[in-house]
């Protein structure tokens, strides 16, 4: 089953496969599935304590890993969270969080469905 290109950019995954074969792209996707929730929790926890430095670090990590797999909406919003955090805009970060959570959930769901389909093949 092909991934939804509005959620995961197939060109990003193709680049990973070009650089390191299917094993690399599968490993990068696995790492996103494994570590992404921790990064999202880091941003949420940071906002609970109004810790913008922690929010910035979590958003930066999430942005980078999302870029690797082509989760462009996650990357874009995480970038906005990172910038707002670095500028001390706590309210803006709080406003962005629901959008980031939604985009992240869609990306995770898409990767999980793809992993299930790949395992069945």
Regions found by a protein language model. Give the residues of each.
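Two-component system phosphorelay core
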Residues: 1-121
């Amino acid at each position: 089953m092909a991934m939804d290109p509005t959620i995961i950019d197939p060109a990003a995954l193709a680049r990973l496969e070009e650089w390191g074969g299917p094993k690399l792209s599968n490993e990068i996707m696995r790492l996103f599935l494994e570590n992404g929730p921790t990064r999202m929790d880091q941003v949420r926890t940071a906002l609970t304590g109004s810790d913008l430095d922690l929010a910035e670090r979590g958003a930066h990590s999430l942005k980078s890993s999302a870029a690797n797999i082509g989760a462009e909406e996650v990357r874009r919003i995480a970038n906005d969270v990172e910038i707002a955090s670095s500028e001390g805009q706590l309210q803006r970060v709080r406003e962005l969080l629901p959008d980031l959570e939604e985009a992240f959930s869609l990306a995770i769901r898409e990767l999980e469905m793809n992993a299930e389909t790949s395992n069945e093949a």
